UniProtKB/Swiss-Prot annotation:
The keyword DNA damage does not apply. InterPro entries: GK/Ca_channel_bsu, Guanylate_kin-like_dom, Guanylate_kinase, Guanylate_kinase_CS, P-loop_NTPase. PANTHER family: GUANYLATE KINASE (PTHR23117:SF13), GUANYLATE KINASE-RELATED (PTHR23117). Essential for recycling GMP and indirectly, cGMP. GO terms for cellular component: cytosol. It comes from Pasteurella multocida (strain Pm70). It catalyses: GMP + ATP = GDP + ADP. One of its GO terms (molecular function) is ATP binding. Belongs to the guanylate kinase family. This is Guanylate kinase. It is found in: Cytoplasm. Its EC number is 2.7.4.8. Residues 4-185 form the Guanylate kinase-like domain.
Length: 208
């Protein structure tokens, strides 16, 4: 069985990353794609489910996992809560041939590249800053001050786009989704992947 591929997905808030991932997963037919579920020390919010949105653990349990080097990446964010990506869980799913998506920012991406040099990374850009702001306002979730802060952070995040293997401009959603699917398809057709996926066939074709 061929190993699954590990993907980093990054984008400024409002670029449509979550919508693209959701649409991709809803269209899959072989259950060979999934989004990694992170560990966190924050309290669950209404509607969040253990193992679906996050794995909710204590600070002591999280720091024990850090000491055992069981996180692919982790960070302590504003407010003092930890967030991290479990290395054993990632390895288990990749071994099953499942493509795993890591929804993280550029800083987490840098950590992961140090541990997994062959990870593939995708950055999603908005068609313009004006459109990005329009989308954030259209959500109706944030105050004017929060939107301004998100826009300021977005410019910093976008400045790291050139650290990624692939870039998708999410202007027309259907085209962006098709571009996303094309990347995943191409990665499954690489020599390394096909040698493992079709090992028996290749051996048969080369048999004398």
């Amino acid at each position: 069985m061929a190993q699954g591929n590990l993907y980093i997905l990054s984008a400024p808030s409002g670029a449509g990353k979550s919508s693209l991932i959701s649409a991709l997963l809803n269209q899959q037919q072989d259950n060979k794609m999934m989004v990694s579920v992170s560990h966190t020390t924050r309290q669950p919010r209404p509607g969040e489910q253990e193992g679906v949105h996050y794995y909710f653990v204590s600070v002591e349990a999280f720091e024990s996992l850090i000491e055992q080097d069981l996180f692919l990446e982790y960070a302590k964010v504003f407010g003092g809560n930890y967030y991290g990506t479990s290395l054993p869980a990632i390895e288990e799913n990749l071994a099953k041939g499942i493509d795993v998506f890591l929804d993280i920012d550029w800083q987490g991406a840098q950590q992961i590249r140090q541990k997994v040099p062959n990870v593939k990374s995708i950055f999603i850009l908005p068609p313009s800053l004006a459109e990005l702001e329009r989308r954030l306002i259209g959500r109706g979730q944030d105050s004017t001050e929060v939107i301004a802060a998100r826009m300021s952070k977005a410019i910093d995040e976008i400045s790291h786009y050139n650290e990624y293997d692939y870039v998708i401009v999410n202007d027309v959603f259907e085209q962006a989704l098709a571009d996303f699917q094309a990347i995943l398809r191409a990665e499954r057709l690489t020599l390394t992947h096909q040698q493992k996926q079709n090992q028996a066939l290749i051996e048969q074709l080369l048999a004398k």
